[in-house]
């Protein structure tokens, strides 16, 4: 979108806000926020939401980012490029909230089941009361599932809106033949949204869609980011998770292995930087901390690979067992006593092909009888 047009619209809002005031019934007036004030409040809400996400305070993050999303739409209009950040982080918070609700739904359900069992053993509970309790618990569980579905759906809608904004911006930049840096920046934003949509698909059980979104994100990242980027490693892990969730363990092993390769490349890169010497103490500390973090992370990745290899082997063993069982069943059937006609029919698949029915030999037609009589008369005359 045109930046100059945005600035012009902002100037109009500032004039309207400073020149007009709403009169209340008591005779007092209240001044509206200027665009600058709203933008400052928006930045504060975004910062607060991101801080809450970092410390895993999802409820607080969701509240701040929900308000930020609403405010950004009020300032710039819906689907404006400047609303992207609010939508992206709000979608992230809502997705985490949906995951939490899904976990909570499983936990209390198990607890209630145990409580009901204890209640069923107590003498002071009648069968009627137990039946009512089970009905109420079932209704509550259904309501919780609906809430979980609503949150999951909301997170998808928010992230999909952000994806559309990024895609439209990239298309506009390419049409304008803008600088490559701006196009790459928005491509990476698109990749970030696609990664979250991939996570959403995994959480929602839509593994094929998750794989497609993550694969698109990976292609963008590999074109823009260095091969040692940890963002690429993260996407590899998520694709591996999508494959594992869909029981494609051979592919899971491959993607987890690629994750390890990227992390090793990053380790090598950091070691070279430190060996060459880093004058900036803060930068050196960052490199050392990241290197330590990667070293601590590596055993977990190797364990994931080992688990995937084990799962792939189990699937292969199961396939072999099913095949052997089927072959054994076929052999048992072959050894069963059969009539001679049945044996011939079983070995002759030609009976499966439909043919026109033949007339019975012992039932000649009238024409055949007449013809036969004439032949006999001819023979007699000879």
Curated annotation (Swiss-Prot):
PROSITE patterns: TPR. Residues 1-39, 103-151, 337-382 are annotated as: Disordered. It holds the Pfam family SHNi-TPR. Changing residue 307 to N: In tu439; strong resistance to B. thuringiensis-mediated killing. Resistant to infection by S.aureus. Reduced life span. RNAi-mediated knockdown of pmk-1 (by injection) abolishes resistance to B.thuringiensis. Residues 10-25, 103-112, 369-382 have a biased composition (Basic and acidic residues). Residues 125-150 have a biased composition (Acidic residues). GO terms for biological process: CENP-A containing chromatin assembly; defense response to Gram-positive bacterium; DNA replication-dependent chromatin assembly; innate immune response. GO terms for molecular function: histone binding; histone deacetylase binding. One of its GO terms (cellular component) is nucleoplasm. Keywords: Coiled coil, Immunity, Innate immunity, Nucleus, Repeat, TPR repeat. Residues 264-304 form a coiled coil. TPR repeats lie at residues 42-75, 191-224, 233-266. It is found in: Nucleus. It comes from the Eukaryota. Gene3D superfamilies: Tetratricopeptide repeat domain. Promotes normal hermaphrodite (XX) development, in concert with zinc finger protein tra-4 and histone deacetylase hda-1, perhaps as components of a complex. May act redundantly with nasp-2. Involved in innate immune response to B.thuringiensis strain DB27 and S.aureus bacteria. May play a role in the uptake or spreading of dsRNA. PANTHER family: NUCLEAR AUTOANTIGENIC SPERM PROTEIN (PTHR15081:SF1), NUCLEAR AUTOANTIGENIC SPERM PROTEIN NASP -RELATED (PTHR15081). Belongs to the NASP family. May interact with zinc finger protein tra-4 and histone deacetylase hda-1. This is Protein NASP homolog 1. It comes from Caenorhabditis elegans. The gene is nasp-1.
């Amino acid at each position: 979108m045109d930046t100059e047009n945005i600035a012009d619209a902002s100037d109009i809002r500032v004039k309207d806000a400073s020149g007009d005031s709403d009169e209340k019934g008591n005779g007092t007036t209240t001044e509206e926020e200027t665009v600058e004030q709203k933008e400052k409040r928006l930045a504060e809400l975004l910062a607060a939401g991101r801080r809450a996400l970092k410390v895993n305070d999802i409820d607080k993050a969701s509240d701040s980012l929900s308000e930020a999303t609403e405010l950004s739409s009020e300032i710039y209009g819906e689907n404006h490029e400047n609303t992207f950040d609010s939508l992206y982080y709000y979608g992230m918070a809502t997705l985490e909230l949906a995951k939490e609700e899904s976990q909570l739904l499983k936990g209390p359900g198990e607890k209630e089941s145990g409580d009901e069992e204890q209640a069923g053993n107590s003498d002071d509970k009648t069968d009627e009361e137990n039946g009512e309790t089970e009905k109420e618990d079932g209704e509550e569980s259904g309501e919780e599932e609906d809430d979980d579905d609503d949150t999951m759906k909301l997170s998808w809608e928010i992230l999909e809106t952000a994806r559309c904004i990024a895609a439209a911006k990239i298309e506009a930049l390419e049409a304008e033949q803008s600088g490559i840096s701006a196009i790459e920046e928005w491509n990476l934003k698109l990749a970030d949204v696609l990664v979250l949509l991939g996570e959403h698909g995994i959480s929602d059980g839509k593994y094929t869609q998750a794989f497609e979104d993550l694969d698109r994100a990976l292609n963008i990242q590999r074109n823009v980011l260095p091969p040692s980027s940890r963002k690429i490693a993260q996407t590899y892990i998520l694709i591996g998770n999508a494959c594992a969730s869909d029981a494609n363990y051979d592919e899971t092993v491959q993607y987890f292995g690629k994750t390890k390769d990227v992390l090793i490349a990053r380790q090598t890169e950091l070691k070279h930087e430190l060996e060459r010497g880093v004058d900036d103490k803060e930068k050196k500390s960052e490199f050392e901390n990241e290197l330590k973090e990667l070293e601590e992370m590596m055993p977990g990745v190797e364990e994931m690979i080992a688990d995937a290899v084990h799962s792939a082997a189990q699937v292969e063993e199961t396939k072999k067992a099913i095949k052997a069982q089927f072959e054994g069943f076929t052999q048992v059937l072959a050894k069963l006593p059969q009539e001679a006609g049945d044996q011939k029919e079983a070995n002759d698949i030609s009976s499966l092909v439909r043919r026109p029915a033949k007339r019975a030999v012992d039932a000649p037609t009238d024409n055949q009888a007449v013809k036969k009589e004439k032949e006999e008369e001819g023979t007699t005359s000879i």
